[in-house]
Amino acid sequence: MTRHTPQEERCMPKIRPAHADDLPAISGVCLAAFNQAVAPSLSAAGIATFGSVAATHAFGARLQGDNLILVAEQNARVVGMVELKEGRHLAMLFVDPACQGQGIGHALFEAVLPRVREPVLTVRASLNAVPTYLRYGFVLDGEVGEFNGLVYQQMVRAAAPSAGADPGPH
């Protein structure tokens, strides 16, 4: 078990399922991180596509479907989020630029792993995020792709050992 100093404990975010009233903050975190790290390398079409996918109402619609959204909350403020689509695809993982480098993204990733329902977890990583996903155990799966202006690298990794296992009687 990892031991944290008292200062680190105060800085560790609370990870919890997203609620409808979190959606504007989730959208804000995603757009801020995207605009800083990803948007400069994309076309106007890619930026517009991401803007529509990361809009508050779009998150609301996905929250009602078979998507799980977890947030990292620090001092009563959403500072990160992860979205798992259909129990098998990591759709988004973003941390507020002001809070990056504190392990929040890794904590969100670790929190979502037990929720994966398939033996393999996939992600379409923005090119700047590929090194992070490699550290998280993903491997490249094919060539760089593009969809509606968003450039990505398909990646895969084995999910948690219990993923895809029979959940037993209900």
Question: Predicted segment positions?
Answer:
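A short helix-loop-beta-strand connector motif used in the catalytic cores of GNAT acetyltransferases and
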Residues: A55-V71, H89
